[in-house]
Amino acid sequence: MNASTTSKKPVIQLKGLNKSFDGKQIIAGLDLNVNDGEFLTILGPSGCGKTTVLRLIAGFENSDAGQVIIANKDVTQVPAEQRHVNTVFQSYALFPHMTVFENVAFGLRMQKVSESEIEPRVMDALRMVQLDKFAPRKPHQLSGGQQQRVAIARAVVNKPKVLLLDESLSALDYKLRKQMQLELKQLQRKLGITFIFVTHDQEEALSMSDRIIVMRDGNIEQDGSPREIYEEPTNLFVARFIGEINVFDATVKERLDEKRIMAEVEGRTAQIHCELAVKTGDKLKVLLRPEDIRLEEINNDEHAKGIIGYVRERTYKGMTLDSVIELESGMSVMVSEFFNEDDPDVDHSLNQKVAVTWVESWEVVLADEQEA
């Protein structure tokens, strides 16, 4: 649960936060630093506490214990309207009777900003989200993506130190969501404002974030860059939650050198990279992403290195061919190969006998643990 160790200055510090609802603890002793100008995503399954963290930062909920510090000021007891943060909700929460301009100007008017200053600031914010020509329209005259942008313009117009986004893209269709992911990231870079984004969508988190926090049961399971989270999961929960992954049972046979061991993986002997302190007989988990696995067809009882299995399912997805391989042990393995129509070995036949292999050192090795 340690905050990221970076030289950047934190704009938000959460120290020992606890929060319970109806006697059930949702957040347990949470510590987190969020750096100035960072795009941080809090990722986790429903009920993990991610939205509660956002609400504690915004001031919509009060913590039972701990501190919320924003820009070096303890705001734990400060009401939401006096914190330098704005929130974009999943529902957008636009005022239906107001025009786009009036929606964006609302917060400035509440702050008693002079009318001469309001118009240029609102139009600047609308230009930033490419909606300046829509200023006279009402929300019902806009598409879902345009309403989303109005909500963002309204949130950034009064220049908050931090922008909080709670599942803000989940109501959009797939194509629009992908477009908004790109636009949000570009907007964040342009503004230099710290964004804290809450989602359960792993792909969204990987594509948008500078840093990801993976949560479970009110605790931080892993804190790292998107690449670290995907390629170097610290436990089975993170590995299974982020994308697809194959988990093989392995038993240590002997250590070969500081970095490699010989192990029995699903009944076949293989060299694997493992820097854990292990001894002969120890149980391990060997993790491989579907795209890291290679298949070699076995014909005419020829000898092949690898774990033996049979092609049970094939799904053509344009760029990739996804296969399900049933190993001799009964385990199912997911494989994703780039589809090359000129390669006769890629388009495997159903029930084809294959050897499952991978490039040495691409595997992630974890100590055996209870299934997450």
UniProtKB/Swiss-Prot annotation:
Gene3D superfamilies on file: 2.40.50.100, P-loop containing nucleotide triphosphate hydrolases
Enzyme class: translocase
Main localisation: membrane
Binding site residues for ATP: 44-51
Pfam name, any one: TOBE_2
Tree of life domain: Bacteria
Places the protein is found: Cell inner membrane
Any one of the GO CC terms: ATP-binding cassette (ABC) transporter complex
Start and end residues of each ABC transporter domain: 12-242
Keywords: ATP-binding, Cell inner membrane, Cell membrane, Membrane, Nucleotide-binding, Translocase, Transport
This enzyme's EC code(s): 7.6.2.11
GO molecular function, a single term: ATP binding
Classification via PROSITE patterns: ABC_TRANSPORTER_1 (PS00211), ABC_TRANSPORTER_2 (PS50893), POTA (PS51305)
Record SMART domains: AAA
Family designation: Belongs to the ABC transporter superfamily. Spermidine/putrescine importer (TC 3.A.1.11.1) family.
Entry function: Part of the ABC transporter complex PotABCD involved in spermidine/putrescine import. Responsible for energy coupling to the transport system.
Protein name per its UniProtKB record: Spermidine/putrescine import ATP-binding protein PotA
Source organism of the structure: Photobacterium profundum (strain SS9)
